[in-house]
């Protein structure tokens, strides 16, 4: 079957931002103006198409990444709407991995906010080209120039305006396109009708200055056009667009546009910018893959290449069961065919292929390189697994996710709920890699862990609504960690003789701190003192032992272990014996390696009216917080601080109380830090 759209006409992009910047509203307008929906859904009344979970409709926030596709100007746009709340950054992370471009949405009143910084960092990690859309230009306090400054100062982003707003706040009624030097004046109707007119006389000088600045910045990306410009020749519209596009593709230059999605102003111009400047799958560099022998290969977005796809999200559909969202990087995948899950080494059947419009399904026969769709029928595939053909096994780079920082105990209310709860928790942890569940060996309680209080609140809510499981919930607990602060050499020797074959494992391991680098294992065995087949079990033995540290039973992190000596027995040595010997060495080292307890520290940003500034500062200090900075935004004060997660429990209630409901805050995990001794005693 031939392609409906040439691969160069594809745009795989995400919409990302801080909570409440207007991502979902912008997505809804994109669906409406591209003809995908015939009625605009609103977030505030629970009618948004992209927010389809009950919890999303109630809370007016986006929890999962809804995927949809639209057509605009002969291009097919795969659009992913991602959450802005810090507890759901995993959704942003896995979406960015499979997208080619992104639109970063800013609130015109607030500019760059904490979660903007987080998602921007994530996008930079994957070198995702971006356009910035300054939304809510009609809002009181909207300030386009402040947004530009905050992009350059807080994100160190090379951001340049390619549009200018005409008016602001209640008087926002148009946009100046600096590429074409035309003004779009809106008549206020719902369908974003606008007239193309001359630039208002009182803005002509500013527009010319901003255009000059834009051209000076963008000609750097094309030598030929730069020469033309330096020789005093006038640049055409196509010349400027070509330079902007080249700049965007470097993922180091970010054009800035503006509008107000709720009032339907600027969305069509944003769609034009997506088509004009964001990359197609063939514009981005080939991705790295690995053959079954471990050798590296570059995978190009080509239909006639070998099949290479990545599962980036699992969702449960009430009608068809498990949906596996995939991005195809190379080759063609047909419904009814078999694929190899290269990560797990198993064969799976593709029963059906569906393109998603929010939570509605559209059946398709095949999916080609560069496209995104959902697969029905993959029973064992999970997030991060690589899919390829059986004939040519290919592995893509795995996806890494943050460890949970908060836990709580849940118990079923009735015997009937017990079995249902186990199945439900298994499904939920399959969908969300940052959600973990396990049984505490000592108390026999079921523990659930996640990225924040809201994350776990949503999980418990889903247990009740989707899976009809009633549970009692314990108080939240912080997920502490343990680590070494000094070097230590230790020996682990495990010998067991009890008739017949014995057990023998003997190791010498040097342990040392490995700040913020996780667990690192180094094999320095020479001369065959320990046979090669026992090296992996030694590493596995250490990893198992580190799951429950010697100090308080919390997982150990940031430790480097160097295996440098040992011995073996021809008959009695076994994998199990070396696993035990490794754990004995770790236990021995903990006596002299300065074992300490670490607690999670959160980066907190509190916004309060000026009259509550002193109260807010005092409250943060009382929570063992350290003030990092403050700034004034309009008539509010913004306080930036680092506060231990343990001290943040109940903060929302307290803040609401002393600010009469006028204060708000956001927080994100920052790092682990040595906990005070008083905490250890507790």
Curated annotation (Swiss-Prot):
Keyword Nucleus: no
Domain tr-type G, chain residue ranges per copy: 8-282
Gene label: fusA
Stated role: Catalyzes the GTP-dependent ribosomal translocation step during translation elongation. During this step, the ribosome changes from the pre-translocational (PRE) to the post-translocational (POST) state as the newly formed A-site-bound peptidyl-tRNA and P-site-bound deacylated tRNA move to the P and E sites, respectively. Catalyzes the coordinated movement of the two tRNA molecules, the mRNA and conformational changes in the ribosome.
A Pfam family that the UniProt record links to this protein: GTP_EFTU
Organism of derivation: Malacoplasma penetrans (strain HF-2)
SUPFAM superfamilies linked to this entry: EF-G C-terminal domain-like, P-loop containing nucleoside triphosphate hydrolases, Ribosomal protein S5 domain 2-like, Translation proteins
CC terms in the record's Gene Ontology section: cytoplasm
Localization annotation: Cytoplasm
Domain of life: Bacteria
Keyword Magnesium included in the entry's annotation: no
GO biological process: ribosome disassembly
MF terms in GO: GTP binding; GTPase activity; translation elongation factor activity
Entry protein name: Elongation factor G
Keywords: Cytoplasm, Elongation factor, GTP-binding, Nucleotide-binding, Protein biosynthesis
């Amino acid at each position: 079957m031939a392609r409906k759209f040439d691969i160069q006409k594809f745009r795989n992009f995400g919409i990302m931002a801080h909570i409440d910047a207007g991502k979902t509203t912008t997505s809804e307008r994109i669906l409406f103006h591209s003809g995908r929906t015939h009625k605009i859904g609103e977030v505030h009344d629970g009618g948004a198409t992209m927010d389809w979970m009950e919890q999303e409709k109630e809370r007016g926030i986006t929890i999962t990444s809804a995927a949809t596709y639209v057509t605009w100007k002969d291009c097919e746009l795969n659009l992913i709407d991602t959450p802005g709340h810090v507890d759901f950054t995993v959704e942003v992370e896995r979406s960015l991995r499979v997208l080619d471009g992104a639109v970063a949405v800013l609130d015109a009143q607030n500019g760059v906010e904490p979660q903007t910084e987080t998602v921007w960092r994530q996008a930079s990690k994957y070198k995702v080209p971006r356009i910035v859309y300054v939304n809510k230009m009609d809002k009181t306090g909207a300030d386009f120039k402040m947004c530009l400054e905050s992009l350059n100062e807080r994100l160190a982003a090379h951001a340049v305006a390619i549009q200018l707003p005409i008016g602001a706040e209640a008087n926002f009624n148009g946009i100046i396109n600096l590429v074409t030097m035309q003004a779009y004046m809106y008549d206020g109707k719902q369908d974003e009708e606008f007239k193309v007119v001359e630039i208002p006389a009182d803005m002509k000088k500013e527009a010319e200055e901003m255009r000059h600045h834009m051209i000076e910045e963008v000609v750097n990306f094309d030598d030929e056009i730069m020469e033309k410009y330096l020789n005093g020749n006038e640049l055409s519209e196509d010349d400027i667009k070509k330079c902007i596009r080249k700049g965007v593709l470097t993922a180091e230059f970010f054009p800035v546009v503006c509008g107000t999605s709720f009032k339907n102003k600027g969305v069509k111009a944003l769609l034009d910018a997506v088509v004009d400047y964001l990359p197609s799958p063939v514009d981005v560099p080939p991705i790295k893959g690995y053959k079954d022998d471990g050798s590296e290969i570059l995978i190009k977005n080509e239909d006639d290449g070998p099949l290479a796809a990545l599962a980036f999200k699992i969702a449960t559909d009430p009608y068809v069961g498990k949906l596996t969202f995939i991005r195809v990087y190379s080759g063609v995948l047909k419904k009814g065919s078999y694929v190899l899950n290269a990560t797990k080494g198993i064969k799976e059947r593709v029963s059906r292929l569906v393109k998603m419009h929010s939570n509605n399904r559209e059946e398709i026969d095949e999916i080609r390189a560069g496209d995104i769709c959902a697969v029905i029928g993959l029973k064992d595939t999970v997030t991060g697994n690589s899919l390829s053909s059986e004939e040519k096994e290919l592995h893509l780079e795995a996806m890494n996710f943050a460890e949970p920082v908060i836990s709580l105990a849940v118990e079923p209310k009735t015997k009937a709920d017990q079995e249902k709860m186990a199945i439900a928790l298994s499904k939920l942890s399959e969908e969300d890699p940052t959600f973990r569940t396990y049984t505490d060996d000592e108390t026999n309680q079921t523990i659930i862990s996640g990225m924040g209080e809201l994350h776990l609140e949503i999980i418990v809510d889903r247990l009740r609504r989707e899976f009809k499981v009633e549970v009692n919930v314990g108080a939240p607990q912080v997920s502490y960690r343990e680590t070494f602060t000094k070097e230590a050499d230790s020996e682990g020797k495990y010998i067991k003789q009890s008739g017949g074959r014995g057990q023998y494992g003997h190791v010498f391991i040097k342990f040392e701190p490995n700040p913020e680098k996780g667990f690192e294992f180094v094999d320095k065995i020479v001369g065959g003192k320990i046979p090669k087949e026992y090296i992996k079990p030694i590493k596995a033995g250490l990893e198992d032992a580190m799951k429950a540290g010697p100090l308080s039973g919390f997982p150990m992190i940031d430790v480097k272990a160097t295996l440098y000596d040992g011995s073996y027995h021809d008959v009695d040595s076994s994998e199990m014996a070396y696993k035990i010997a490794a754990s004995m060495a770790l236990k021995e080292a903990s006596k002299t390696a300065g074992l300490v307890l670490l607690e999670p520290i959160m980066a907190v940003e509190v916004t309060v009216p000026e009259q509550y500034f002193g109260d807010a500062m005092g409250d943060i200090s009382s929570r063992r917080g350290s003030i990092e900075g403050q700034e004034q935004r309009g008539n509010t004060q913004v306080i930036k601080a680092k506060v231990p997660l343990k001290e943040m429990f109940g903060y929302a209630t307290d803040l609401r109380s002393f600010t009469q409901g006028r204060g708000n805050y956001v927080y994100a995990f920052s790092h682990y830090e040595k906990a005070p001794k008083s905490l250890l005693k507790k």
